[in-house]
């Protein structure tokens, strides 16, 4: 009989289960308290109960655990310095959506060579998240794959659904199941209505198919996530200006949703020129000084060294520099955070 299925796949290996990985890298009581408390603080900021600003900042993607931990250690110092004005969360992105093809992130390809040792990638991701949280730094990530969230979601304080997946029904269902607040990016064309629709969908209860912690495919009923919000990331043109934010708030108001949002300084808002993140920062700081309460948070891409680099086989990588989108360097990061804290001071 002719085969009609699995004609374009080849088995590689079995995937470790979330339960097995959690046994190797368990959440300690201290980390559990830290994650729970940071989620609550973020929720209060997004609801307007806390006047401080949520600052999600870090490398475009994680590829080197040593450099990531050095960045986290430096970020913890900034957290301590500005904790009365800012809730600083480290961007720890392990999955990269690609427009066509390219490196898909630490989980998929931890060796950066197309070997796709996913079990090892999952282990590295969980190990790093534990270490960063043990430092006292909350973590943020994009939830892209429908399976990998089960391996790391217990260590995440804030999640994002990307511009390419905000319209996806299964990602909206996943967001309704997640235990952390979730931001939805506007579409790559700049359309914010799809993010508002995603917020509404994620607030509802859904039947959701997912592997459980033991790898058994399971039918879950979600209770809905009340902490969905828009991430203004720009599109064909930036959308961080005051009139753009007012228009987004009008749409939120139309559906009785909280008029609080997050502004992404990178991507479409910096027109893929990383140093323009500083210009976006100046504009947002002025809006905050002018009394804007809609801006609950910001996102920025920064690392130890400015810019980006290509992966070239046989050649060493520059330590602390991005291998995906270009990032601000550490000195600019310190300046950006200081400016944000100074602007938020006017809210008090």
UniProtKB/Swiss-Prot annotation:
GO-annotated cellular components: cytoplasm
InterPro entries named among the record's database cross-references: Aldolase_TIM (IPR013785), DAHP1/KDSA (IPR006218), DAHP_synth_1 (IPR006219)
GO MF term (any one): 3-deoxy-7-phosphoheptulonate synthase activity
Protein's pathway: Metabolic intermediate biosynthesis; chorismate biosynthesis; chorismate from D-erythrose 4-phosphate and phosphoenolpyruvate: step 1/7
Pfam families the UniProt entry points to: DAHP_synth_1 (PF00793)
Enzyme class: transferase
UniProt entry tagged with the keyword Ribonucleoprotein: no
GO BP annotations, alphabetical order: amino acid biosynthetic process; aromatic amino acid family biosynthetic process; chorismate biosynthetic process
E.C. number(s) listed in UniProt: 2.5.1.54
Keywords, in A-Z order: Amino-acid biosynthesis, Aromatic amino acid biosynthesis, Transferase
Catalytic activity of the protein: D-erythrose 4-phosphate + phosphoenolpyruvate + H2O = 7-phospho-2-dehydro-3-deoxy-D-arabino-heptonate + phosphate
Gene3D superfamilies with a match to the protein in the record: Aldolase class I
Protein function: Stereospecific condensation of phosphoenolpyruvate (PEP) and D-erythrose-4-phosphate (E4P) giving rise to 3-deoxy-D-arabino-heptulosonate-7-phosphate (DAHP).
Family: Belongs to the class-I DAHP synthase family.
Protein name: Phospho-2-dehydro-3-deoxyheptonate aldolase, Trp-sensitive
Species, as recorded: Escherichia coli O157:H7
Taxonomic lineage of the native organism: Bacteria, Pseudomonadati, Pseudomonadota, Gammaproteobacteria, Enterobacterales
Gene: aroH
